[in-house]
C-alpha cells in the first residue's frame, strides 16, 4: 500500500486568515487520494486559528504555531521539518483543490525518475474559466523577469498536457522529498516572492526536471494574503528581483541586467508612480533597491 500510495504531506501557511484556511481544508475533504496528511503552519497570527480549525473536523490535519512570521520561504521550510511524507504538496491557503489533484500530480514522477517538481494548472477562483498559470518561460537574464504561460487566457483545453517548464509556481507544487534533501529548501533570505524561482534554478542546475501537469487543477484566490497591489508587495518584488539576479547571474549577464534596471526600470517606475500619485509605492520601490546594498546575497537553505 505504501509503494502504491506514497504518503503526501500537504503543507499550507496561515496568517490571520482562519476562514480562508478553513475553506481550503474543506476543499481538501474531496481529495480521492487515500494517503495524505495536512500541516497547517500558522505564522504568528493575532487571531487564534485553534478556535476555528479543529482536529475533530479535520482528523488528518495538524496545526503548528510559529512564534514569529517566517514568511513564505521560512514558513514552508518550517512546515517541511514536521512533514512525514515521501512527497510535499506546498500549496497556498487561498486555493481550493480538485478531487483527483494528487493522483494527477504524481504521474510525471512515475514517468521520469529525474522529475523534481510538478505544478498543476492554476485557474482564477473568481473566474474559473480563466487560467492564471500554465507554466513559466525561462527567466530573462536581462530583465530579471519571466513570463507566465497562459495567463488570463480562457481555458479551452489548450494546455491539457504534461510538459516541461522552467519554473514552479509558489501557489501549488508537488515536490519529491529526496529532491529537497539533495538540493535544499527555500532560500529564506527572500521572505516573499522570487524564492520559488531561485529554488527552481537550483533544482534545474542539479539536473532535475520541472513539469506542468495540465490535467490537474487548483483554483487560486489571487493575492488574498498580501493584496493585489500594495507597497509591501512592491518592496519585496523589487528587492528580490535584484537579489535573485545577484545570486544567479554573473559577469556580463549581471552587468546587462544592472544596465537595463538602471536605465529603463528605474526611470519608468519612478515616472509611473509620480504621475499616479502613488508615493508610498515609490518609496517601497527605492527601499527595495537600497536594501540590496546592505544585505548579503547568501541565504542558508
Give the positions of each predicted feature.
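Catalytic donor-sugar/metal-binding loop of nucleotide-sugar-dependent glycosyltransferases
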Residues: 181, 185-191, 197-219
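Short aromatic/hydrophobic "clamp" motif used to bind/position activated sugar donors
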Residues: 88
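Short, acidic, metal-binding catalytic loop of nucleotide-sugar glycosyltransferases
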Residues: 26-35
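Short beta-strand/loop segment that forms part of the nucleotide-sugar
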Residues: 36-44, 64-66
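Acidic/His-rich active-site region of diverse nucleotide-sugar glycosyltransferases
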Residues: 74, 78, 103-184, 189
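Acidic donor-binding/catalytic loop of UDP-sugar-dependent glycosyltransferases
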Residues: 47-48, 95-108
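Non-catalytic, C-terminal membrane-associated alpha-helical segments of glycosyltransferases
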Residues: 232-240, 251-301
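Glycine-rich, basic loop-to-helix element that forms the pyrophosphate-binding segment
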Residues: 65-83, 93-95
Amino acid at each position: 500500500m505504501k509503494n502504491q500510495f506514497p504518503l503526501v504531506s500537504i503543507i499550507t501557511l496561515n496568517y490571520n486568515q482562519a476562514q480562508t484556511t478553513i475553506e481550503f481544508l474543506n476543499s481538501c475533504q474531496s481529495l480521492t487520494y487515500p494517503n495524505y496528511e495536512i500541516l497547517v503552519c500558522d505564522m504568528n497570527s493575532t487571531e487564534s486559528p485553534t478556535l476555528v480549525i479543529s482536529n475533530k473536523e479535520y482528523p488528518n490535519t495538524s496545526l503548528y504555531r510559529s512564534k514569529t512570521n517566517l514568511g513564505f520561504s521560512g514558513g514552508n521550510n518550517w512546515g517541511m521539518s514536521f512533514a512525514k511524507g515521501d512527497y510535499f504538496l506546498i500549496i497556498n491557503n487561498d486555493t481550493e483543490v480538485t478531487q483527483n489533484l494528487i493522483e494527477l500530480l504524481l504521474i510525471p514522477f512515475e514517468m521520469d525518475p529525474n522529475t523534481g517538481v510538478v505544478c498543476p494548472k492554476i485557474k482564477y477562483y473568481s473566474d474559473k474559466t480563466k487560467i492564471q498559470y500554465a507554466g513559466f518561460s525561462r527567466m530573462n537574464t536581462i530583465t530579471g523577469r519571466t513570463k507566465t504561460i497562459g495567463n488570463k487566457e480562457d481555458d479551452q483545453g489548450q494546455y491539457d498536457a504534461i510538459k516541461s517548464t522552467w519554473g514552479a509556481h509558489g501557489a501549488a507544487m508537488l515536490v519529491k522529498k529526496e529532491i529537497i534533501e539533495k538540493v535544499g529548501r527555500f532560500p529564506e533570505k527572500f521572505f516573499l516572492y522570487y524564492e520559488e524561482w531561485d529554488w527552481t534554478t537550483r533544482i534545474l542546475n542539479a539536473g532535475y526536471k520541472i513539469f506542468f501537469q495540465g490535467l490537474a487543477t487548483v483554483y487560486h484566490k489571487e493575492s488574498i494574503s498580501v493584496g493585489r497591489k500594495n507597497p509591501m508587495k512592491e518592496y519585496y518584488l523589487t528587492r528580490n528581483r535584484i537579489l535573485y539576479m545577484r545570486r544567479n547571474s554573473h559577469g556580463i549577464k549581471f552587468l546587462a541586467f544592472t544596465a537595463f534596471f538602471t536605465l529603463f526600470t528605474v526611470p519608468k517606475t519612478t515616472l509611473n508612480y509620480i504621475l499616479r500619485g502613488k508615493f508610498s509605492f515609490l518609496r517601497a520601490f527605492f527601499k527595495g533597491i537600497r536594501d540590496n546594498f546592505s544585505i548579503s546575497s547568501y541565504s542558508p537553505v
